[in-house]
């Protein structure tokens, strides 16, 4: 009789477990059928608009882009860091411009954007300039720290992929306050640096910007632009600034010697022309 009682209790526990699983599945199905909220629809529209722009620009694929793709596929999350103008945002957009993420990808700029995300309607998110755009912003960090553990749980559960973009100097200031978050561990980070670009990649990037802005430059001058390059602004953005602005283009290869100096001198005008990214 004692054995029969134990068996009945085990059977009851198993039955309860089965009922709980069924109820959980029914709730999950109901959530998956929920329509998208208006905020999420707007974010998706804005994201697709950015991807359309990216495709028109026909950005140059690089070895580093392949490295980023492999890391994202293997780990489900990646932190893309580097100096201004290295192409962090472009890289992030390139990674989500994949048929497997169609209609389920969004770029987020703040925690308010994250609140609109439903993982039944989103497979991948980009957290853009997560801790500040031009300098470390403690208030942004504090806001994101409320949600980053949940985002990490979604990644671990296979419900979401995450791409974080941040300037390297800003991330270094945020590190001490990130606690045990695995999202920002070194093995999930990829640094973009112009020093990593091959000569052929730099030439392709320069040629693409010259073509885009209908500029002509002799081959020896192009070579000087590449060999002269120095500065804290990434080579990709230097090429964009150089080809897109008459004053900077008139400087010729000299611009690439001291792009920071010319950038600061013309920053207001360049911001108006939306060259900054």
Q: What is the predicted role of each segment?
A:
Residues 1-67, 73, 94:
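Charged, amphipathic alpha-helical interface modules that flank catalytic cores or transmembrane segments
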Residues 19, 31, 35-36, 168-180, ...:
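Amphipathic alpha-helical "lid/sensor" segments that cap RecA-like P-loop NTPase cores
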Residues 74-91:
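Walker A/P-loop nucleotide-binding motif
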Residues 77-79, 105, 124:
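Residue-level preference for the first positions of well-ordered beta-strands
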Residues 79, 95, 126-129, 161-168, ...:
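Hydrophobic, repeat-rich solenoid/adaptor surfaces of innate immune receptors and signaling proteins
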Residues 97-107:
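Post-Walker A helix-loop "phosphate-sensing" segment adjacent to the P-loop in P-loop NTPases
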Residues 110-112, 118-145, 165-168:
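Conserved P-loop NTPase "ATPase switch" module shared by AAA+ and STAND
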Residues 145-160:
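Substrate-engagement module of ASCE P-loop NTPases
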């Amino acid at each position: 009789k004692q054995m029969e009682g134990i068996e009945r209790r085990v059977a009851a526990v198993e039955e309860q477990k089965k009922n709980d699983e069924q109820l959980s599945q029914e709730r999950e199905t109901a959530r998956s059928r929920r329509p998208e909220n208006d905020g999420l629809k707007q974010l998706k529209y804005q994201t697709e608009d950015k991807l359309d722009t990216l495709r028109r620009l026909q950005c140059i694929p690089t070895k580093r882009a392949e490295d980023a793709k492999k890391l994202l596929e293997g780990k489900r999350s990646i932190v893309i860091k580097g100096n201004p103008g290295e192409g962090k945002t472009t890289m992030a957009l390139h990674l989500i411009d994949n048929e497997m993420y169609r209609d389920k990808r969004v770029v987020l700029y703040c925690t308010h954007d994250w609140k609109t995300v439903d993982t039944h309607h989103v497979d991948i998110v980009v957290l853009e300039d997560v801790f500040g755009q031009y300098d470390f912003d403690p208030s942004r960090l504090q806001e994101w720290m409320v949600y980053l553990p949940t985002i990490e749980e979604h990644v671990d559960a296979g419900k979401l992929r995450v791409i974080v973009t941040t300037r390297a100097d800003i991330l270094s200031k945020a590190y001490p306050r990130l606690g045990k978050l695995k999202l920002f561990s070194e093995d999930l980070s990829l640094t973009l640096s112009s020093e990593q670009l091959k000569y052929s990649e730099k030439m392709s990037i320069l040629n693409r910007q010259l073509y885009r802005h209908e500029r002509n430059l002799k081959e020896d001058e192009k070579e000087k632009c590449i060999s002269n390059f120095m500065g804290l602004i990434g080579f990709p953005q230097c090429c964009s600034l150089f080809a897109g602005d008459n004053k900077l283009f008139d400087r010729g290869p000299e611009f690439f010697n001291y792009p920071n100096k010319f950038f600061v001198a013309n920053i207001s005008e360049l911001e108006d022309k939306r060259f900054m990214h």
